[in-house]
Amino acid sequence: MAEAEESPGDPGTASPRPLFAGLSDISISQDIPVEGEITIPMRSRIREFDSSTLNESVRNTIMRDLKAVGKKFMHVLYPRKSNTLLRDWDLWGPLILCVTLALMLQRDSADSEKDGGPQFAEVFVIVWFGAVTITLNSKLLGGNISFFQSLCVLGYCILPLTVAMLICRLVLLADPGPVNFMVRLFVVIVMFAWSIVASTAFLADSQPPNRRALAVYPVFLFYFVISWMILTFTPQ
Amino acid sequence: MAAVDDLQFEEFGNAATSLTANPDATTVNIEDPGETPKHQPGSPRGSGREEDDELLGNDDSDKTELLAGQKKSSPFWTFEYYQTFFDVDTYQVFDRIKGSLLPIPGKNFVRLYIRSNPDLYGPFWICATLVFAIAISGNLSNFLIHLGEKTYHYVPEFRKVSIAATIIYAYAWLVPLALWGFLMWRNSKVMNIVSYSFLEIVCVYGYSLFIYIPTAILWIIPQKAVRWILVMIALGISGSLLTMTFWPAVREDNRRVALATIVTIVLLHMLLSVGCLAYFFDAPEMDHLPTTTATPNQTVAAAKSS
């Protein structure tokens, strides 16, 4: 027979009692609430939300997406440590930016000399495959960011460089010369630094701390190559 | 009455007892390496593993042996398998790069720095940086050489980036493949040869290309003598790195075969650097030519007008 050396709530009794014998004497006092309800209070509202986006006008849908994209542009232009870009990622912004950049960077197809600037497809491929490679690299190094979140951040942080491209295009309408080049160089360098700072602010936290430099260097190379393409753009 | 023995927890912490209960189980233990499944996919380690550890007298050869066996246990179609090739920290990559820049005679790069942890991060990103360094430097150098000419119109020469990428990546992957195949073949004939795994050879080649990045940037200087001195320095450093890595591997072999292998390795390396210099960078004497072609036009125009 089992003998308990000491039973709970009964220190120092001489008589041995079997284990758990006192359990039936325990009663739950009434002031500990042990009952409740399991409901999801938001449930009915979510269902209403779903059906309402189906019936709304096309303008509302487009405006909502455009506002989300615009909000993320603001986050890139004023990079703070927020995770709006990460939480509500979308790829519309990167697509718009990449298409704009590629359209402005492509060389004139009527003047297709052998060694000119990049074609539309080349810019597109560099941007998207570069972003995919950097994402794969950071995941392989052990980062805990998801694939599309990383693509989203890298795509959105091309915004300063697209602005630089627009400015360079405008500056190139003036007379060519060293002053022209200096202005473009300055603008591209500033926007390059801005892109790096913005993307590092979003991406650096997701890496293990002893590999942060390894994950950030490819981002630096990526934006450097894009800046080089912008700087060396010459209208035919 | 309940027996106390029935209520005791079963101890799971001891691998030995659970293995005696079930000998085929795979146990994972934090302190010691556990049993890993023997049917690993063909990671080309080869039978040379024990021999090279004995030959080169590494004092933590036990640890590297066991760690090497423990590492690649995921099947090759999972993501974790490829993550094992990126298992390096920042300081390790910097150490490997420093080791490739300062080859010390007698120190084997693979044994000293790679230590059974070959990574693909270094080779891949060093090659990517080198591709863009060569293309951008070549473009800049051509621009500076032809700067004063009236007939010169600057073009970004974007096509050269894809050509450079093809050349560099083909060199960094196909030459190690050929070398690994050759070493495996000799290993089957001469039993004492130290053989490296394919990834270690890729790793050595990748890190040996690092010296060409500052070399490519310095090739912008449009002086022929400076460029050739840079070629010699870079070839000296990376060639000696490769030689010191592969000499222990072919030392046991027939003298002529060993020498031929080393000479081929260095020759291919030289071919890469000289080829890149010749293709991407215009010769600096070209700026003299357009002034001589300009003057005949002027004389013809003067003759026509008179």
Swiss-Prot record, chain A:
Major localization listed first in the record, in broad terms: Golgi
GO cellular component: a single term: Golgi trans cisterna
Subcellular location: Golgi apparatus membrane
Membrane-topology descriptor: Multi-pass membrane protein
PTM-bearing positions, type N-acetylalanine: A2
Subunit structure: Predominantly interacts with YIPF1 or YIPF2, but may also form a ternary complex with YIPF1 and YIPF2. This interaction may stabilize YIPF1 and YIPF2.
Protein name from the UniProt record: Protein YIPF6
Organism: Homo sapiens (Human)
